């Protein structure tokens, strides 16, 4: 019988907290914390470390990667919140500022497909632009993360 010990990296919680504070301060005023965007790099690094650690633990336990289980676990973790957030956000925009609904179909589709970052790049969107309203601009991070989730097991396999 193979016993698998699931490791928790408790120290990463503090690092994620520091990164989150840096990101929030950076978004409040880019001049306040000039390097605040490094918080995003920290989140990407931690996510990569945790995903690869999880995949390597599965391989070491003799189970293999288990592509189906891996992808289903990620989808179950991310999509329920997206499925709830998108209609709520669109509904609020309908009542508050309908200008925010310009291009909403493309935004919703690309968010759900995990390729919003490419849509934003292709449309020439600037993250801090005040001229082009976009309710889902912050989800570029989730799109990059979803793309990483898609590729990570293939990189190890």
Short names for language-model regions:
Residues 1-157:
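Membrane-interface helix/loop caps of multi-pass membrane proteins
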């Amino acid at each position: 019988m193979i016993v698998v010990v699931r490791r928790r990296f408790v120290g990463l919680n503090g690092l994620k907290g520091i990164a989150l504070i840096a990101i929030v301060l950076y978004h409040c005023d880019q001049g306040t914390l000039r390097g605040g965007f490094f918080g995003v790099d920290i989140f990407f690094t931690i996510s990569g470390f945790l995903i690869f650690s999880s995949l390597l633990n599965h391989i070491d336990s003799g189970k293999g990667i288990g592509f189906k289980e891996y992808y289903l676990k990620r989808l179950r973790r991310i999509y329920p919140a997206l499925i709830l957030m998108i209609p709520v956000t669109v509904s609020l925009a309908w009542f508050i500022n309908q200008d925010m609904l310009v291009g909403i179909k493309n935004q919703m589709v690309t968010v759900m497909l995990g390729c919003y970052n490419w849509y934003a790049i292709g449309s020439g969107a600037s993250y801090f632009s005040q001229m082009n309203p976009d309710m889902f601009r912050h989800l570029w991070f989730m799109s990059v993360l979803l793309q990483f989730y898609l590729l990570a097991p293939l990189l190890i396999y």
